[in-house]
A protein has these predicted regions:
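N-proximal, solvent-exposed amphipathic alpha-helical segments enriched in charged/polar residues
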Residues: 14-52
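Catalytic domains of cell-wall/extracellular-matrix polysaccharide-remodeling enzymes
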Residues: 227-231, 235, 251-375
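Short, non-transmembrane amphipathic alpha-helical segments
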Residues: 68-86
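Acidic/histidine-rich, surface-exposed loop or edge segments in extracytoplasmic proteins
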Residues: 49-64, 187-194, 249
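Surface-exposed patches in mature extracellular/periplasmic domains of secreted proteins
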Residues: 84-96, 218-222, 279-285, 367
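Active-site beta->alpha N-cap acidic-glycine motif
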Residues: 155-252, 256, 260, 264, ...
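Sec-dependent N-terminal signal peptides
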Residues: 5-13
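N-terminal pre-catalytic segment of deacetylase/amide-hydrolase enzymes
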Residues: 18, 89-192, 199-204, 353-356, ...
Length: 375
């Protein structure tokens, strides 16, 4: 059969941005703070989703023994609830001093209000299932602030042209194995996806909103985040959501040698398999930046590479009304919506978006349901 690329290229959209496109930083998010007096507080913030509030307390400490870290975490939990009794959950991240965001924490914990008494009575940290102790891992790459805009194929022009044509073809006929740009435009179903999970402040609030609506989604998980907050990964799975691979360190893959690309994907797979017992089926490259080598390695690891049709720019600090208009304008059968797990704007517009999809008769769900959607 003759290839259809030349015909499709006549109809293809303008070329996507190339590798030189500047990286857009996450905007500063001015969150309300808790007035904690405990020494070593780096940040103590809280946030609500219209139904519940959660807090995230970050501390730096010279302590290294598990019992000392636990005592500090317990003091922080007590102070947080004294400062704001309405909190439904307090989440903690304890780092070695001096604090560096690129390090893995020494200890993390999640304390729902209903388990506060249990947590405060602990004498041994390993007896609490929503606590993680760093086993001594160091030397991690800092995560890059690579934010998704639109897919960026990098490589020969023939490869970029082929990918543009594939994108256009799928927008008319639906997804194909291996690389997914679009769902079936003839089915009243769209995929809802969140990148950069899990986050100790935002993930519990997102889970609560999705549970209230009965909607399932795909969360593309950063391996180092999953390693430090495994209980949130378990929460996602227990709630019926799907997990995808978003690399271990969240770095641009095309610039890496093939063995490092493979390592990024393998490490994330291994972390998720250790936590959940299952290896993910889907992968999304950070920033949507990929090359023939990235696709080949993902395919060899049994991962389908997933892109998106709709990115409203929730990371850009836009007003809720702007995000709502963008989401509504692009809501369509077969769409793949990209939002982020760590942005205030996502929490603000998600209820509106879920309601609009229902009004239009569109079912929202995980990527894995795209080929299975039926009228």
């Amino acid at each position: 059969m003759e290839p259809v690329w030349p015909l499709l290229l006549l109809l293809a959209p303008l070329p996507w941005g190339e590798g030189g496109t500047p990286v857009k930083p996450l905007p500063y998010q001015d969150l309300p703070t808790l007035g904690l007096t405990l020494p070593g507080v780096v940040r103590a913030v809280y946030l609500g989703n219209g139904h519940i509030e959660a807090a995230h307390v970050v501390l730096e400490t010279q302590a290294r023994n598990p019992e000392g870290l636990l005592r500090l975490a317990q003091q922080a939990v007590e102070e947080a609830w004294r400062a704001r009794p309405s909190l439904a959950e307090v989440d903690l991240s304890l780092y070695g001093a001096p604090y560096r965001a690129e390090d893995l924490p020494l200890l993390t914990a999640s304390v729902p209000q209903g388990r506060a008494r249990e947590f405060l009575a602990l004498r041994e940290p390993r007896r609490y299932d929503r606590l993680w102790l760093n086993p001594g891992k160091t030397g991690f790459l800092p995560p890059e602030p690579v934010l998704e805009d639109k897919p960026h194929p990098e490589g020969p022009e023939s490869f970029r042209a082929k990918e543009r044509a594939t994108q256009l073809l799928q927008s008319r006929t639906g997804p194909r194995p291996g690389v997914i740009y679009h769902g079936d435009p003839g089915r009243p179903f769209a995929a809802l996806t969140f990148d950069d999970a899990p986050h100790p402040l935002f993930t519990p609030l997102l889970l609560d909103l999705l549970a209230r609506s009965g909607v399932k989604a795909t969360f593309f998980v950063i391996g180092r985040n999953a390693e430090a907050y495994p209980y949130f990964v378990r929460d996602l799975v227990a709630a019926g959501h799907e997990l995808g691979n978003h690399t271990y360190h969240h770095v641009r893959l095309p610039k890496l040698p093939p063995e490092e690309v493979r390592r990024e994907l393998l490490l994330c797979n291994q972390v998720l398999a250790a936590i959940t017992g299952t290896t993910p089926r889907y992968f999304r490259p950070p920033g949507g930046r990929y090359s023939p080598e990235v696709l080949r390695i993902a395919r060899e690891l049994g991962l389908a590479t997933v892109f998106w049709t709709d990115d409203p720019g929730d990371y850009a600090g836009l007003a809720p009304g702007v995000l709502e208009r963008r989401l509504e304008a692009h809501l369509r059968p077969g769409g793949i919506v990209l939002l982020h797990d760590n942005v205030v704007g996502t929490l603000e517009v998600l209820p509106f978006f879920l309601r609009k999809a229902k009004e239009r008769g569109l079912v929202l769900g995980p990527v894995g349901a795209l080929p299975l959607a039926r009228r």
